[in-house]
Amino acid sequence: MAKVSSIKKNESRKKKSQSLHNKRSALKSKIYDKNISLEERFSLVMSLAQLPRNSSSTRIRNRCELTGRPRGVTRKFGISRNKLRELIGRGLVPGVIKSSW
């Protein structure tokens, strides 16, 4: 089980990222617009830098929903490989069966 503080930190990053997503994407689209003067684009870059670091979506870590494990998390299920294997073995994941050949 992961530390509760690291799980809470990741949750707060998700909330900040969602709340500032529109502002951040609008600034980025204006920064990459070549029709705007260089001085204005530089001021937009500075305003983007003033936003909190944790509002960036790249700082969010995919964690297991059951254990909080940060590595080996499947995108489809949102569960770590260990728990997924355990649940599939018990037959608790619908539509997934253990293969045998």
Curated annotation (Swiss-Prot):
Listed GO biological process terms: translation
Annotated region (Disordered), positions in chain: 1-26
Signal sequence coordinates: none
Molecular functions (GO terms): rRNA binding; structural constituent of ribosome
Gene3D superfamilies with a match to the protein in the record: 1.10.287.1480
Family: Belongs to the universal ribosomal protein uS14 family.
Its biological purpose: Binds 16S rRNA, required for the assembly of 30S particles and may also be responsible for determining the conformation of the 16S rRNA at the A site.
The protein's name: Small ribosomal subunit protein uS14
Species assigned in the record: Rickettsia akari (strain Hartford)
Protein's gene: rpsN
